[in-house]
């Protein structure tokens, strides 16, 4: 931080971004390296996530498909909009 200016993304609350992308395709990467791609249905303050039309990828290869998937927030490394 120079001259009191915040760098991009620093100090921002992600809840606004997450509420804007509900209903859209997202990628969720877990701390284990497993990736889920699906339609974001909900996310709470603990980063617990509900997805629909979900695909699971392990080491880059599609492993399974799920109608609904629920991910506990403490396992989430990041969520990105696709």
From Swiss-Prot:
PANTHER family: SMALL NUCLEAR RIBONUCLEOPROTEIN F SNRNP-F, U6 SNRNA-ASSOCIATED SM-LIKE PROTEIN LSM6. It is found in: Cytoplasm; Nucleus. Belongs to the snRNP Sm proteins family. SmF/LSm6 subfamily. The keyword Lipid metabolism does not apply. Component of LSm protein complexes, which are involved in RNA processing and may function in a chaperone-like manner, facilitating the efficient association of RNA processing factors with their substrates. Component of the cytoplasmic LSM1-LSM7 complex, which is thought to be involved in mRNA degradation by activating the decapping step in the 5'-to-3' mRNA decay pathway. Component of the nuclear LSM2-LSM8 complex, which is involved in splicing of nuclear mRNAs. Component of the heptameric LSM1-LSM7 complex, which consists of LSM1, LSM2, LSM3, LSM4, LSM5, LSM6 and LSM7. Component of the heptameric LSM2-LSM8 complex, which consists of LSM2, LSM3, LSM4, LSM5, LSM6, LSM7 and LSM8. The LSm subunits form a seven-membered ring structure with a doughnut shape. One of its GO terms (cellular component) is sno(s)RNA-containing ribonucleoprotein complex. Gene3D superfamilies: 2.30.30.100. This is U6 snRNA-associated Sm-like protein LSm6. It comes from Chaetomium globosum (strain ATCC 6205 / CBS 148.51 / DSM 1962 / NBRC 6347 / NRRL 1970) (Soil fungus). Residues 13-82 form the Sm domain. GO terms for biological process: maturation of SSU-rRNA; mRNA splicing, via spliceosome; tRNA processing. Keywords: Cytoplasm, mRNA processing, mRNA splicing, Nucleus, Ribonucleoprotein, RNA-binding, rRNA processing, Spliceosome, tRNA processing. GO terms for molecular function: RNA binding.
